[in-house]
């Protein structure tokens, strides 16, 4: 199992909690976390792309993903960087060029997470294209064809439904094409992703929910691309404490739902515009991306046992949220990594 974490572009992760132990939506904090994670041996960070804050409410600060990703690449040595991109907000030719440059800056540690969007209000405010659910996956497919074509060919041409690229040149090309991650749960989403992505990422679930999903997307990719996905990642919110009682107390603290909180409206819009294959609970609203559904809550030994079930289900990358992140990255590295055979350089005081 490899371990990654979400870069805190919103400051914190919790919708029901205001201040999160010094987590702030600033480059200073992101730099602190990035350097720490790199030193501790974390494998990858997912940098979400949202121009509005869907955790703390749209009036709260949030940082821009692409400028952050370039900066993270410059201050780390080993940490892989997975930057989210929504095709409705970008030209694929420009993203191909930008990605090639960040790949060079990072010595080929850069990858993309293609997100087919869900937030109509954000698209309205920032001028993004917000097509219907199935249309967004068609657009994403064309978008990735252009990325891969420009990274590969001397001149790339495509006349598509969404894009017209007339013999475009990209130089210098990346030494290694950035890996394309993507996630989706609907029938159309899984089919499209199996055709264009290299790796699959999903929101949190139970082992019984995840295992058939992983088997399904691998089978689709074998049919459409001739092989399994190179990685399968899952979002998870992790709470590790010295005793189970302490962990459950923290869980109770962060899941006391306030329907009047600023982030509640964006949660309801996410439900409306995403064809999910499970029903979300208000508890899952508390942290987003169904991060609590895997139930990685307890002592390090209990969480390690649970992670073993996800390994058996086919997950090989956990994308962790936890709060406050700077403390929890070190706690997880020191207490959990050794139980799973993951090299850790953490030393808790």
What are these regions (language model features)?
Residues 3, 37, 41, 72, ...:
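Conserved, mostly hydrophobic/aromatic
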Residues 3-5, 45-47, 80-85, 110-114, ...:
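Hydrophobic faces of well-ordered beta-strands that scaffold small-molecule active sites
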Residues 5-9, 35, 39, 126, ...:
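An alpha-helical appendage that flanks or caps ligand/catalytic pockets
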Residues 13-28, 84-93, 129, 174-185, ...:
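Active-site mouth loops of central-metabolism enzymes
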Residues 28-48, 192-203, 309-315:
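Catalytic domains of carbohydrate-active enzymes, especially glycoside hydrolases
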Residues 38-39, 70-78, 99, 103-110, ...:
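Acidic (Asp/Glu)-rich catalytic clusters
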Residues 56-82, 139-143, 223, 330-348:
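Alpha-helix-loop-beta-strand connector modules within alpha/beta enzyme cores
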């Amino acid at each position: 199992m490899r371990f990654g974490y979400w870069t805190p572009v919103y400051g914190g992760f919790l919708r029901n909690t205001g201040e999160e132990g010094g987590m702030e939506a600033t480059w200073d904090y992101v730099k602190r976390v990035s350097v720490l994670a790199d030193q501790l041996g974390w494998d990858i960070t997912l940098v979400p792309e949202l121009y509005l804050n869907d955790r703390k409410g749209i009036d709260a600060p949030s940082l821009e993903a692409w400028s952050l990703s370039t900066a993270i690449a410059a201050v780390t040595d080993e940490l892989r960087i997975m930057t989210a991109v929504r095709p409705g907000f970008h030209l694929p030719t420009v993203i191909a060029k930008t990605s090639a440059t960040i790949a060079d800056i990072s010595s080929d540690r850069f990858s993309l997470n293609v997100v087919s969007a869900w937030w109509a209000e954000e698209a309205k405010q920032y001028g993004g294209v917000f097509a219907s659910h199935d249309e967004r996956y068609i657009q994403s497919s064309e978008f990735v064809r252009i990325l891969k074509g420009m990274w590969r060919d001397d001149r790339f041409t495509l006349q598509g439904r969404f894009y017209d690229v007339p013999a475009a040149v990209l130089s210098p090309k990346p030494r290694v094409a950035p890996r394309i991650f993507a996630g989706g749960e609907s029938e159309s989403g899984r089919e499209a992703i199996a055709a264009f992505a290299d790796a699959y990422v999903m929101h949190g679930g139970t082992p019984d929910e995840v295992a058939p999903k992983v088997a399904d997307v691998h089978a689709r990719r074998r049919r459409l691309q001739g092989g399994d996905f190179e990685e399968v990642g899952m979002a998870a919110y992790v709470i590790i404490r010295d005793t189970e009682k302490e962990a459950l107390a923290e869980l109770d603290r962060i899941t006391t739902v306030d329907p009047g909180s600023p982030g509640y409206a964006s949660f309801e819009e996410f439900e409306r515009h995403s064809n999910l294959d499970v029903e979300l609970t208000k508890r899952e609203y508390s942290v987003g991306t169904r991060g609590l559904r895997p139930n990685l809550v307890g002592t390090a030994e209990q969480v390690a046992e649970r992670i073993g079930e996800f390994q058996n289900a086919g997950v090989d990358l956990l994308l962790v949220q936890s709060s406050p992140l700077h403390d929890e990255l070190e706690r997880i590295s020191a207490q959990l990594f050794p139980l799973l055979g993951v090299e850790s350089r953490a030393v808790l005081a």
